[in-house]
């Protein structure tokens, strides 16, 4: 699915070499790349120093949940993905004026330089706010897949590098399902340059530094303390540093533990591409395993996600939709190679490897805190699909407008005091997480908990019913456009269409799983 990077990443100890499997025959040359990539990465780590070091301190994480969000047992691969060389992308420090720490009080500091952070900083500065952006100067390294019409609506169609006229789903050996919606692959380079250009034009300031902590001053200001004893005073701070932001934010207690979507991908030149280049393969759940590999499928059901860039160049990705414990990347790679071998695909050249790690579900931020959040740090990742970039980019203007209005109304009248901050921050939080959004999220969390319990045949059965509901429903579900009332209607249709064993499972899940009680309680709250 969509790949979302984890921006605030650190390790709890010195990196250790992951266990990598090698296989005989033709699979050996395909497996070499992950080993060589790790060797090159480890060498870079050993030779680096200072803020760019690959060894980070345990204190970078607030708790075990934060560590899992950052990458947990797969952290080394998450860091390898982050450290990819993307020479085409401009450096933020070369294009944006530097923050002069201590010389002025900024209206807003945005922590984190991913798509969410850049978008919010640019939109806020466009409205006249004095905005500072703080975070390591890293490129966009993840591949993003989007529905073409959604990116067009954002005015970002020029950032799409390839479009497929339709998307296709395979569940078993029966007829495939055409979704009826064009899909695009986003150019990392074009998206980075476009968002950076917007920041430059709006006058966003920048500091290439990690943030140590955020301190609330007695005068109502926030102090952003960075490396090297640099302190930036500001009126508001928004954390957009990825899912693992517990060091700066408080999250609600009592929510289900965060789950993880992992995917291993390769862009390759191949012989015998089995897929139509005009169609993007959204999910391929067909059976491809031999008896000696069934245990892999039993523990971690996965599907193939494929983007044919040409008749011979394809991006293949083996994806575990969600798991309580992250499916290891070496197992994902093994399953991908087994699948490609079964399909008769022979890899001639590897252009790039990708390690996608997306925390899904978990807790919402505590909306009574002054420090704000945006993007994955604000739990804006869709719990059931792993998508978040379109939502972050589409909601950035609205969030920026709310912040600008708050500052105009209160600061211009010298009303922004420490005592008024909590109620003012609540206004911003309620824009990001109104009750309607919370209802939708409770529905998705209920669905996520159900998916976590299903084996491969259960997942196929679920999606057979899913794609039999009215088309506008499942298209809206995948595009995150259904209201909470629409989602209830969707659930009703699913229940009517589903086989008896799934109906029983749905009732049991609603009555016994904590997400069922949360769903009912959230829907009844107004």
From Swiss-Prot:
It catalyses: a carotenoid psi-end group = a carotenoid epsilon-end group. It is a multi-pass membrane protein. GO terms for molecular function: intramolecular oxidoreductase activity; oxidoreductase activity, acting on paired donors, with incorporation or reduction of molecular oxygen. Keywords: Carotenoid biosynthesis, Chloroplast, Isomerase, Membrane, NAD, Plastid, Transit peptide, Transmembrane, Transmembrane helix. The keyword Heme does not apply. It is found in: Plastid, Chloroplast membrane. Its EC number is 5.5.1.18. The chain crosses the membrane at residues 443-463, 477-497. Catalyzes the single cyclization reaction which converts lycopene to delta-carotene and neurosporene to alpha-zeacarotene. Required for lutein biosynthesis. Belongs to the lycopene cyclase family. This is Lycopene epsilon cyclase, chloroplastic. It comes from Solanum lycopersicum. The lineage of its organism: Eukaryota, Viridiplantae, Streptophyta, Embryophyta, Tracheophyta. The gene is CRTL-E-1.
